[in-house]
Amino acid sequence: MTAVESRPAGVALTPSPGAHRPSGARVKAFVALTKPRIIELLLITTVPVMFLAAQGVPDLWLVLTTTIGGYLSAGGANALNMYIDRDIDALMDRTSQRPLVTGMVTPRECLAFGIALAVISTVWFGLLVNWLSAALALGALLFYVVVYTMLLKRRTSQNIVWGGIAGCMPVLIGWSAVTNELSWAAVILFAVIFFWTPPHYWPLSMKVKDDYARVGVPMLPVVATNRVVAKQIVLYSWVMVAVSLLLTPLGYTGWFYTAVALLSGGAWLWEAHGLQNRAKAGVTGAKLKEMRLFHWSITYVSLLFLAVAVDPFLR
């Protein structure tokens, strides 16, 4: 039985004919399709990299156009993701209030909205930023929608590892927006986000693994024990912190960034090893405290990239 066939009675993916959908609520629903909270994290990595690339304050008009373009591109990717995943979203508690599940937006509207944002964002980047940034943004969108959502998500426990590449692209976009080229600094920060993504997302997946198991999505916490997942989190965390420290010896950052990277990275490793110790001890449920690392991961990436932006002014 497929996820769609097993959908509980009363859960609709499209509104009933004549369903009342207030215009204000409809606007909010279309905004929700873009997943604004996820996009906040993407922009946290984009704008600071522009400061590093400019070695100071970048052109503010360029920052604005890049930010808007990034929102449109990521929003389009997220809308298309919701269109593709609408069957399993209806079965998961965490996603049960998404616009396609509640019927506030129809699948056809969502698909058209996502495609429109993809086209508009690509043209926006090309005309107002540069075509390298446009190509990177389009590549990120296609990778997220096709490679992650369509090919990896429902097939492999390594889905978030390789699918996370799309979430690394804003770093490259921010750098290319300023310089119209890429450099090792951008590649290093890309790698930081690449190794950050699994230990950021797996703790959340541990919390909601029953949701994923119900719809047959093989997230690592679904197919492996907490002990195995925690070990993987620790391994990725150590690599992430090590990679974050490469910027300074290569001459891209100075003492301030290094201090923040060491302190925040040390705190991250403390939390990661704490989770591993609890998992080894067989702790389950609320006492596992896996969400502590999830929340800290957001603080960590915010602090690290704030340091990326501030460091050029202190050298």
Curated annotation (Swiss-Prot):
It is found in: Cell membrane. Pathway: Porphyrin-containing compound metabolism; heme O biosynthesis; heme O from protoheme: step 1/1. Its EC number is 2.5.1.141. Keywords: Cell membrane, Heme biosynthesis, Membrane, Transferase, Transmembrane, Transmembrane helix. The chain crosses the membrane at residues 38-58, 60-80, 100-120, 123-143, 159-179, 184-204, 233-253, 255-275, 293-313. GO terms for cellular component: plasma membrane. It is a multi-pass membrane protein. One of its GO terms (molecular function) is protoheme IX farnesyltransferase activity. InterPro entries: Protohaem_IX_farnesylTrfase (IPR006369), UbiA_prenyltransferase (IPR000537), UbiA_prenylTrfase_CS (IPR030470), UbiA_sf (IPR044878). It catalyses: heme b + (2E,6E)-farnesyl diphosphate + H2O = Fe(II)-heme o + diphosphate. Coiled coil: none annotated. Residues 1-22 are annotated as: Disordered. It is an enzyme of class 2 (transferase). One of its GO terms (biological process) is heme O biosynthetic process. Its main location: membrane. Carbon 2 of the heme B porphyrin ring is defined according to the Fischer nomenclature. Converts heme B (protoheme IX) to heme O by substitution of the vinyl group on carbon 2 of heme B porphyrin ring with a hydroxyethyl farnesyl side group. Belongs to the UbiA prenyltransferase family. Protoheme IX farnesyltransferase subfamily. This is Protoheme IX farnesyltransferase.
